[in-house]
Structures are given as C-alpha cells and as structure tokens.
C-alpha cells in the first residue's frame, strides 16, 4: 500500500489494493450533483450556480453571461424550451460562440445576439454535445495510473475524441509542495508524430500527492461515446475549440490541436453507443495480460440518475469479475458513496472534483487539470 507523505492529519492511501473492485454502491445513489439537484429544471438557479461555483474567477465572459441569464426571465424561458440535458450553460454558451457571438462581458450585447440568432444556436445545441476534451486532465490521472501494474488497457467512457487515452504520449511538468518541479517526457512518440508535438501539461501536486516517476505502459486505447469525435475532422476540431472557455484559448487551443494531432495519427478504438450499455464490450476488447482501467472525467453529470446508478453497478461488477480498475474524476456530489466519504466542507463546493479509485475518494482536483490535492479524511 502506498501512502501519501504529508501533514500529521490522517491522509487516505493514494492507492489501496485495487482488487477486488469498488465498494458496493447504495441502491438509492441517484440524486447527487449540480445536474440533478432539486432545481435542475430551474434555469435561473442553474445559471446562478454556474456563475457561483464554476466560472467565478476563471472566465469573466461566462460569468457575466451566466449572471445575466439568471436574472433574465425571458432568456430563461428561451433556454427552458430545450431538452433538460441540453440546457447546460457550457453547451448553450459554446453554441452561441460557434454561431458567431462576440466574447463580450456586455450581457446586453450577448442577449441581443442570442435572441436574434436563437434558431441557429438552438440547432447547434440540439446537434452537438458538451464533449470538452481537455488533455490536461491526464495530469490528474497520471499519479494514479502510474501506480497500477502494467501493461494497461485504457477504457474511457464518454471519450469524445479520446484525448485522455494518451497519457503516455504527453509531457508533464509537476510542481510539488515546496515549489520543486518534476518533469516527465515520453521516450518516443509514434513514428508519424514528431516529439515537439507533445504538449507539456503543467499541474500542481498538493498536500503530498507523489510525483509519478514513470509513464504508464499503455497497450490498448478504447472507450465508448454516443458520438465519437474524429480528431482529424476540421468541423469537429472547430467545435472542440468553441468549447474552450473565453480567455483560455491562448493556453488551451495549442494544447488541444497538438493532442488532436497525436490522436489522429494513432486513433483509439472508441465504440459508438451508450456508455452504460457498452462498457462491458469496451472492456472485453482489452487484450489478455493487460489490466483494464475504466475511467471518466466530468461525464456522469450528463447521465440521468437511473443510468448513472446502472453504470456504477456494471463497472463495479467489471472490477470484481474482470480485474478492472475504475478511476472516476467527477463533481463532488455525483456519486453518493464517494461523497459520503469526503468532508462536508468539500461536499458544499460544487465546483470541486473528486478523484476516486474503485469507489474510494483519494484526492480533489481542478476540473481542467491545473492541480490535484491529496484528500485528508477525519
């Protein structure tokens, strides 16, 4: 068992024995997460929460838009006409920008554009998904992946273009407690990709998260998505750029483009279908002699509660029967059994993500991979 060094407070082991599978999830695990709270159908409250918990201090443009919509009954009514799962602020805002909205903090100007171009925005919303594919989330996954004996078969559910399936192809610069840095680089990349194409992922490892000393030995890259994105398709690449938040393009667009190039040169095996129904098939495709690692980042909030419960049941069984390891990086309240194990102060912060291995919370993390912090349990 590997422990995190650090304070005198009792810290959870970063990697408890990974087999058998996750702790049993309760049958009533069906009501956590901002997507499923009591006011999920209240557009005003949903956008107010988005402003308060998700974008404050991160993107002034989206903060202004979300606050404006929260206080704008006519625009709330417009958005309420969308299917519930399509009312997500990130999706509506990305669709508006994709349709040509200026990235302005002037809410009145944004409102005028949104109402004037609603038919186009609505069509984009209905035909696209929030498939944010942030390769930097690999920096959050790597400390845990590097502790699993290889070789590994990675299975990402909700994979989008599959950019998080290449943790061994990226370079990393970790900042440790005290300010020291640790760098990791791939020994070699696919022959069709030059080493300079590997993006460098910066991440702070806080409160004793150990710096990975090696990149994982990945022998299979697979997954499931309702609408897998072709990393070589120009229109798909343009949509992924629209999903990047205003003010973050200078850092994230070059990283996205580099990661898409890596994926296009060595495409993953992503099954088109429902992640609940197809997770077993994705694991069955893993080669013998490898450890299947089923993982997901910021995905389960887009499932209805019964589907989320069924997914947990199935992945739990895969861990027990197929020797799989399950890594979840999700909003703090999305998995009841995970949320029950973290301090109340953390549960109150809807913007926090929790990293759990086999249903056991081990760390909190930034949603886009800026930092990961060892979880202190009382």
Located regions from the model:
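A short glycine-rich, Lys/Arg-flanked "PGG" loop and its adjoining helix->strand segment in the class I
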Residues: 310-321
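Non-catalytic accessory regions outside enzyme or core folds
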Residues: 30-81
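N-terminal amphipathic/basic-hydrophobic helices that include classical n-h-c signal peptides
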Residues: 1-34
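Conserved beta-strand signature within the Rossmann-like core of class I S-adenosyl-L-methionine
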Residues: 322-330
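Class I SAM-dependent methyltransferase Rossmann-like catalytic core
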Residues: 77-149
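C-terminal region signature
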Residues: 334-378
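Class I S-adenosyl-L-methionine-dependent methyltransferase module
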Residues: 82, 101-102, 132, 149-156, ...
């Amino acid at each position: 068992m590997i422990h995190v060094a650090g304070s005198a407070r009792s810290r959870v082991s970063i990697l408890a024995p990974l087999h058998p599978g996750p702790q049993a999830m309760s049958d009533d695990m069906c009501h956590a997460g901002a997507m499923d709270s009591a006011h999920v159908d209240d557009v005003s409250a949903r956008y107010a929460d988005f402003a308060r918990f998700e974008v404050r201090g991160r993107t002034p443009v989206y903060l202004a838009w979300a606050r404006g919509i929260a206080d704008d009954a006519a625009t709330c009514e417009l958005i309420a006409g969308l299917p519930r799962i399509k009312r997500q602020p990130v999706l509506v805002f990305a669709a508006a920008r994709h349709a040509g909205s200026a990235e302005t903090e002037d809410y009145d100007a944004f409102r005028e554009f949104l109402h004037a171009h609603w038919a186009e925005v609505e069509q984009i919303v209905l035909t696209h998904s929030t498939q944010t594919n942030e390769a930097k989330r690999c920096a959050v996954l790597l400390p845990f992946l590097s502790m699993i004996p290889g070789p590994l078969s990675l299975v990402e559910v909700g994979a989008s273009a599959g950019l998080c399936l290449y943790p061994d192809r990226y370079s990393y610069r970790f900042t440790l407690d005290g300010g020291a840095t640790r760098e990791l680089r791939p020994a070699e990349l696919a022959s069709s990709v030059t080493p300079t194409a590997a993006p460098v992922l910066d991440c702070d490892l806080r409160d004793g998260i150990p710096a990975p000393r090696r990149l994982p030995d990945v022998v299979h890259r697979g997954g499931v998505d309702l609408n897998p994105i072709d990393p070589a398709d120009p229109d798909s690449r343009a949509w992924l750029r629209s999903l990047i938040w205003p003010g973050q393009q200078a850092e994230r667009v070059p990283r996205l483009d580099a990661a898409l190039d890596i994926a296009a040169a060595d495409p993953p095996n992503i099954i088109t279908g429902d992640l609940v129904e197809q997770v077993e098939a994705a694991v069955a495709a893993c080669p013998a002699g490898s450890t299947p690692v089923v993982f997901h980042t910021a995905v389960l909030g887009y499932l209805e509660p019964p589907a989320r419960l069924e997914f947990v049941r199935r992945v739990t069984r895969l861990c027990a029967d197929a020797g799989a390891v399950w890594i979840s990086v999700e909003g703090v309240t999305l998995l009841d059994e995970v949320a029950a194990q973290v301090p109340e102060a953390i549960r109150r912060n809807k913007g926090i993500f929790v990293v759990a291995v086999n249903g056991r919370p081990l760390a909190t993390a930034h949603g886009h991979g800026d930092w990961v912090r060892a979880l202190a349990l009382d």
